[in-house]
UniProtKB/Swiss-Prot annotation:
SS bonds (residue pairs): none
Organism the protein comes from: Oat chlorotic stunt virus (isolate United Kingdom) (OCSV)
Gene3D superfamilies registered for this protein in UniProt: 2.60.120.20
Coiled-coil residue spans: none
Subcellular location: Virion
Family matches, as InterPro entries: Capsid_prot_S-dom_vir, Viral_coat
Gene Ontology molecular function, alphabetical: structural molecule activity
Name assigned to this protein: Capsid protein
The entry's keywords: Capsid protein, T=3 icosahedral capsid protein, Virion
GO cellular component: T=3 icosahedral viral capsid
UniProt function note: Capsid protein self-assembles to form an icosahedral capsid with a T=3 symmetry, about 28-34 nm in diameter, and consisting of 180 capsid proteins.
Family: Belongs to the icosahedral plant coat protein family.
Length: 454
């Protein structure tokens, strides 16, 4: 008989689940007689989850699933005596699955195992966000990939210790590239569920350690070595080719999103996630940092108290007294909203344009046009630290030039985003400087800014 779990009447789910539980218990007893109570409970739970995902089952099918699952859990060679010997001495006949039978630090509880030749891993993540209204709150569930994390700098073909921290706040685009665009429109948030997973990018011939942990004080410095990382109360450590996940314990407190200005990060952040790698080697030559794993975040978050997060700022500078000593001239500056300022340098080679922006990602454009008024003097084409396409043309009685730069800028809370324009000697001329800034919400803009490879 085949039972389809997707077609169970509404009044029967309890009875059907009970029948399935009994069937799974019988299958476990058939495959591994005498399994301990705790081990059996864990096995039954895992087998039921597999069966429910399939949607249909038969008695023989459940037995096959039970045998496969018990093998993955290392229980096929289980005997009570070998289990007791394993617990006491670390020896025995029980097979250990390194990715499952680990303590808080991700180390095996006992026994040894060789790295497999290869691992086949299917990663099924939530492809579409779930957005629901629950009372006054917007509840969002989603999965995001932050990007590849690099190892430390290698020395003698072994990478150095490297640990990086990222603040767990929905308003931070560095760690929540998709969620942050929505979260900045709300005053407060509360995580219902939060986890971080490291998905390996390397083969099984790599040795060393990688890990992911969580520090509930986001103002703390990240661990400086593996001993400090191991001291984190919530962390997972593994081989470079093994997947690692850390589940974050979420409290019931509402906190301000990243756009709120606070003297102490602990008042607005749930904490900070830290990722670590140390002594990674592949037995060959390593001449540069390696991309070791992707960092994936899964979450369910509540957002409350909507707020308007629109922002724009424009700076205009016009001058008819343009000199080489004052690259942007002495004309009046006109600003709107937040006050970007032009600071003329004491030399003719640098000019610093300073923007004060709230937290978020912004697209900043710069437009500079100049004219010498004569054909005899041709100004040198300016360059910028961000790079741009610049032009300089001489026609008739006038020499003029235009440059246009468009680049994303990210601000963490209310910090200053400084853009350096390298402007060489220019003759007296007319100059117009235009620098609008607007909040950037496009995924491409975030991808240009978010680089966790470091």
């Amino acid at each position: 008989m085949t039972l389809n779990l997707r077609k169970v009447p509404a009044y029967l789910p309890g009875k059907v689940d009970g029948a399935l539980t009994n069937l799974v218990h019988a299958a476990v007893d058939h495959v591994v007689p005498g399994l301990g109570k705790a081990e059996k409970a864990a096995a039954v739970y895992n087998i039921k989850q597999v069966v429910k995902k399939l949607g249909t089952y038969t008695e023989q099918g459940v037995k096959k699933i039970a045998k496969k699952t018990l093998g993955e859990l290392g229980y096929l060679n289980y005997t009570p005596s070998s289990h007791l010997g394993m617990a006491i001495t670390g020896r025995g006949t029980k097979q250990i699955n390194m990715s499952r039978s680990t303590n808080a630090g991700g180390f095996a509880l006992g026994g040894t195992t060789a790295a497999p030749v290869s691992i086949s891993r299917n990663i099924n993540r939530r492809s579409k966000p779930s957005i629901k209204m629950m009372g006054d709150a917007v509840v969002i569930s989603h999965s995001e990939m932050l990007g590849a994390i690099n190892s430390g700098t290698p020395s003698s073909n072994v990478t150095a210790f490297r640990c990086t921290g990222y603040r767990a706040n929905p308003g931070m685009s560095t760690i929540f590239p998709w969620l942050s665009a929505t979260a900045v429109n709300y005053e407060k948030y509360k995580f219902r569920r939060l986890s971080f997973t490291l998905v390996p990018l390397v083969s099984t011939n790599y040795s060393g350690r990688i890990g992911v942990g969580f520090d509930y004080d986001s103002s703390d410095l990240v661990p400086g070595n593996r001993q400090e990382f191991y001291a984190l109360s919530n962390h997972c450590e593994n081989m470079p080719w093994q997947e690692s996940t850390v589940e974050i314990k979420c409290d019931n407190a509402y906190r301000f999103t990243g756009t709120h200005v606070a003297a102490d990060n602990k008042l607005i952040d749930l904490g900070q996630v830290v990722v670590m790698s140390d002594s990674v080697s592949n037995g060959g030559t390593i001449s540069a940092a390696l991309p070791l794993f992707d960092l994936i975040v899964n979450y369910t978050v509540e957002l409350i108290e909507p707020q308007q997060a629109l922002f724009s700022s424009q700076l205009y500078s016009g001058s008819t007294t343009f000199t080489s000593g004052i690259p942007l001239g002495t004309g009046a500056d006109t600003t709107t909203v937040v006050g970007p300022t032009v600071v003329n340098s004491t030399t003719v080679t640098n000019c610093v344009v300073t923007f004060k922006l709230p937290a978020g990602v912004f697209e900043v454009s710069y437009f500079i046009a100049w004219s010498t008024g004569t054909a005899a003097v041709v100004p040198t084409v300016p360059t910028t630290g961000a790079g741009s396409k610049l032009s300089n043309t001489s026609t008739g009685s006038n020499s003029y030039g235009v440059c246009f730069i468009n680049s994303p800028v990210e601000c963490d809370l209310l910090l200053t985003a400084t853009v350096l324009l390298i402007i060489p000697t220019l003759p007296s001329s007319t100059c117009v400087f235009h620098a609008p800034a607007r909040r950037c919400t496009t995924p491409m803009c975030h991808r240009l800014l978010t680089s966790l490879a470091g």
